[in-house]
Amino acid sequence: MNTIAQNNIIIPIRKENAHKGDHGSVAIIGGASGMLGAVVLASRAALVTGAGRVYASFLSEHTPEVDLMYPEIMVRSPEALKSLVQLDCVVIGPGLGLSNQASTLLSFWLNQPVPLVIDADALNLIASDNLLSNLLKQRQVTSIITPHPGEAARLLNNTSKDIQENRIESALKLAQQYHAICVLKGANTVIAQENQYHINTTGNAGLASGGTGDVLSGMLGSLVAQGLDALEASKTGVYIHGAAADSLVAKNIGPIGLTASEVILEARHLLNGLQ
């Protein structure tokens, strides 16, 4: 079994003479009305796990002008974001919703030569729209998809029960069908690429709470932007995400009541400890 362990993940290196441009730029797109927190969590996770520049883009009309806790995060409208040329990775899906605007934005970014992390409602849109599905399959640059079992079932026109009973086979099928790296979330997350797979052994039931998936997508975007290839970014991100939850539980911060925001800060602590 190909398990992910501390000795086979890659941590981004920080040079003493580095500047913020060396650590990549990542944008997080989503946050429709009622779901702004998803983008907030993902963008904070991207920032705190090392991205040099982080942009947050909300679909909601009631967009915050600044994240008061992390004013380092730059807020841009979805239209303004399209003109940014220095993006190293785009995360699309957290709180995106299923509107026509969401579908149009997803179509735009699927057509761009920039690495994508595709999560949540972006996956639901792809599952329900052949045009979007084909755009993903035809991409020539990095794509990481991060479905939970329900989203995976929709992408494969299957049932969640079947996904859970055949997790490795399902992850491989998703990776092959959509020409992407698949991060099939859940207990023992499976990461699949073409004909290979890896199983994560970190994490616990504390991660079964709102927002932890958004945190993971932000972490993955951050690691890709910092220069890790998509497979290594996925392995490292999933391992650290789960290990952060394990570390918190060891301190009696969870599993009951463990929050996504707590995972972000613990992930930073672990990344620095592994440098």
Name each model feature, range by range.
Residues 1-117, 124-144, 149-275:
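Small-residue (G/A/S/T)-rich helix-start motifs and N-terminal tracts that mark the onset
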